[in-house]
Amino acid sequence: MSDRFDAKAFLSTVTSQPGVYRMYDATGTVIYVGKAKDLKKRLASYFRQQVGSRKTETLVKNIAQIDVTVTHTETEALLLEHNYIKLYQPRYNVLLRDDKSYPLIFLSADSHPRLAVHRGAKHAKGEYFGPFPNSYAVRETLALLQKLFPIRQCENSVYRNRSRPCLQYQIGRCLGPCVAGLVSEDEYRQQVDYVRLFLSGKDQQVLHQLIERMENASKALNFEEAARIRDQIQAVRRVTERQFVSGNSDDLDVIGVAFEAGMACLHVLFIRQGKVLGSRSYFPKVPGGTEMSEVVQTFVGQFYLQGSQMRTLPAEILLDFTLPEKELLAESLSELAGRKIQIQSKPRGDRARYLKLARTNAATALTTKLSQQSTIHQRLAELTKVLNLSEINRMECFDISHTMGEQTVASCVVFDANGPLRSEYRRYNITGITPGDDYAAMAQVLKRRYGKALEEKKIPDVIFIDGGKGQLGMAIDVFNSLNVSWDKNKPLLIGIAKGADRKAGLETLFFVPEGEGIALPSDSPALHVIQHIRDDSHNHAITGHRQRRAKVRNTSALELIDGVGPKRRQVLLKYMGGLQPLLNASVEEIAKVPGISQALAEKIYNALKH
């Protein structure tokens, strides 16, 4: 029992109602969140002579304070528990580190519906199909749908302001509902119905309707229309033959589990209408000594309850592990979905095959992850030795990217003991410096990054500066000038100078801004981890710079025209549907834009053409 916490006095005040409890350490940090049907009984179990596990024993030693929140029901407690876990990320809870919502396909409720990728809460009116494992899978499906059923995928701002069809119409990927007379209302509605049926897994219904339409067109001697529908039928058949998985209209998620060397992998297989939409592996953060049942229980709860607004819940969830609170979880999910959701742990037939597939994928992904992590750990151990440090828990690396000094972007990437922490990668738009002054750019990003309060765990052990001796000297000056409460002398600052011809393996490391640096052997594991973090930083900076440059270019041509201020630029781009349609527009089309006279339209036309 913790001598900093009076458990007996605390327990005498606790109710026996359902609720959620938060445990804090001496610094006021939440270290564990739990829920209970009976708060008094559950909390008392932590302070017995025998607590049951090493993890619980360590947890109790660190308790300095406990807060409780009483709820009406156990289901309410379960939801609140997972909200608190997401909010506080306590170190003794199993944590699902990637809880992003899955991308969906959105079919809008407009008079001429459009297809789009959607991620997040379902606020827009329309229908949602999915989930898909990643945005690539969604875009691939949208590209396929464009070929099969050419309904629009453009933004409403573009659609409303077109006076002639775009390139998608010219190549047969859109029916062109933006221009009157190109497609009838009935034909467009029919294609939207096909999309709806196809995304709902009703491929055969789509084929039957298309075949019927082809036969009717043939009987009416409309052979050109019949041939077009025939080609559409063949395209749909080719796709459905590739996608077919089972004869059942299964609508379920299948979760396979693998556990080895203190690491867990949960592989989720998404099956909708009997088709595998994709799958994804998760590696939750597991505190030492955690039971496997707790890992699975917490993962399933966080996976569905924390993202309930964003996720499409299946009718059934298959697991290869019996959950201790299966009924409660199923009840909570059913309540959220407004329909019954089952959780099965002993399926038969096709479902058992799905589960075996998920389990195999989990084991394979875990083996790969352990192998990669072993390599990362070896490289970090070697780097720790090379830098003469006791340990490295966190590293950060900075790089600058610009084109002739314009649209300068700085990047910061973060590695921990397990490699890249992509959720903590950041970009900084650099302003107010002399264009092309990389030293000033680096000074600005370092001041913005470190000139504020930092948590102990956020203070890096090593900071890499891409740029060699000059940049390192400037970084040291910045750190000397910092007036902060945290230990600014903790990070080791290292400059990385690129090798001759910028070849990998010829980098030089500088620890002081004068004198000779050191070059590690090209086969050194320590050098490999430095190259990894440096390359990630470089790529992150370049990507950010290109995005910023593209954004500026979209409006820079208009900014040079006298008489076209910010408001007119906005109206022009909105009315025309973007810069490219404006570049292709005639003087007469530009003059139709509200607030643009014939004379100004000619000026805009001539400026954009020349």
Swiss-Prot record:
One Gene Ontology biological process: SOS response
UniProt function note: The UvrABC repair system catalyzes the recognition and processing of DNA lesions. UvrC both incises the 5' and 3' sides of the lesion. The N-terminal half is responsible for the 3' incision and the C-terminal half is responsible for the 5' incision.
GO molecular function, one term: DNA binding
Major subcellular site: cytoplasm
GO cellular component, one term: excinuclease repair complex
Quaternary structure note: Interacts with UvrB in an incision complex.
Source organism of the structure: Serratia proteamaculans (strain 568)
Protein name (record): UvrABC system protein C
Residue ranges of every copy of the GIY-YIG domain listed in the record: 16-94
Family, per entry: Belongs to the UvrC family.
InterPro entries noted in UniProt: GIY-YIG_endonuc, GIY-YIG_endonuc_sf, GIY-YIG_UvrC_Cho, Hlx-hairpin-Hlx_DNA-bd_motif, RuvA_2-like, UVR_dom, UVR_dom_sf, UvrABC_protein_C
Keyword set includes Nucleotide-binding: no
Intracellular or extracellular location(s): Cytoplasm
CDD domains tied to this protein: GIY-YIG_UvrC_Cho (cd10434)
Keyword terms: Cytoplasm, DNA damage, DNA excision, DNA repair, Excision nuclease, SOS response
Residues of the UVR domain: 204-239
Listed Pfam families: GIY-YIG, HHH_5, UVR, UvrC_RNaseH, UvrC_RNaseH_dom
